[in-house]
Amino acid sequence: MAESSGSPHRLLYKQVGSPHWKETFRQGCLERMRNSRHRLLNKYRQAAGSTPGTASDRLLVQEVMEEEWASLQSVENCPEALLQLELPLDLAVLQDIEQELCNEEKSIISEYEEDLEFDESCLRRMLAEWEANSLICPVCIKYNLRIMNSVVTCPCGLHIPVHSTDLTEQKLRACLEENVNEHSVHCPHTPVFSVTGGTEEKPSLLMNCLTCDTWAVIL
């Protein structure tokens, strides 16, 4: 669909700025793109991981440029000198800024994909270790858990008394795997485990995910 002559994007090509304002616009766009990481990744996930650099991905670049231009033109942020500009803006400047934003967008997506791949690798490793004969402690992911006299312990310092007298390593492993697999259905990131509670409160083993903000009590 062709853009109207009065659209914010087209207006970018009908204004001019001194080198000072061009640099201000450029820096503002880059900062706005970095601050829009959550919005960009939502668009990326909704597009089911389409290749960065396509028209749908560059849509955020256009939005960022239009938003920053509108911010520069606001009464509070824009000196009178900028409001009086009328000459055509150098297209090469806008194209350079647009390309720089595209590169920043690709960098954000690439970093997200690397983090996602690392999380998936950690999840596979965690599940593989749990399927082994020994039950790896989910908190330190280093030492083996032991269950003796209804107390779950680990050399890392984990010490959790449990009410159930028939809790075994097999049952605890099954519980851990069930919760991790249930979480992975709706979130690809690896959850973390921690122990809460103090001297006046029974310690508990919790699973939580910093990405999707979900949590579950394991013990």
Swiss-Prot record:
Q: Which GO terms describe its molecular function?
A: protein-containing complex binding; zinc ion binding
May I ask which residue range the UniProt record assigns to the signal sequence? none
Organism of this sequence: Mus musculus (Mouse)
**InterPro entries attached to this UniProt entry:** RIP, RPA_interact_C_dom, RPA_interact_central, RPA_interact_N_dom
Q: Where are the zinc fingers (RIP-type)?
A: 137-212
Q: Which positions are tagged coiled coil?
A: none
Q: Does the keyword Chloroplast apply?
A: no
Alphabetically sorted, this entry's keywords are:
Metal-binding, Nucleus, Phosphoprotein, Ubl conjugation, Zinc, Zinc-finger
Q: What is the lineage of its organism?
A: Eukaryota, Metazoa, Chordata, Craniata, Vertebrata
Residue positions, PTM Phosphoserine = 18
Q: What is this protein called?
A: RPA-interacting protein
Q: Cite the post-translational modification comment.
A: Sumoylated; required for localization in the nuclear PML body and transport of RPA complex in PML body. Upon UV irradiation and during S phase, it is desumoylated, releasing RPA complex that is translocated to sites of DNA damage. Sumoylation takes place at different Lys residues.
Looking up Pfam families in the UniProt record yields:
RPA_interact_C, RPA_interact_M, RPA_interact_N
Assembly with partners or alone: Interacts with the RPA1 subunit of RPA complex.
Q: Name one GO cellular component term.
A: cytoplasm
The superkingdom of the source organism is: Eukaryota
Annotated segments matching region Mediates nuclear export: 164-180
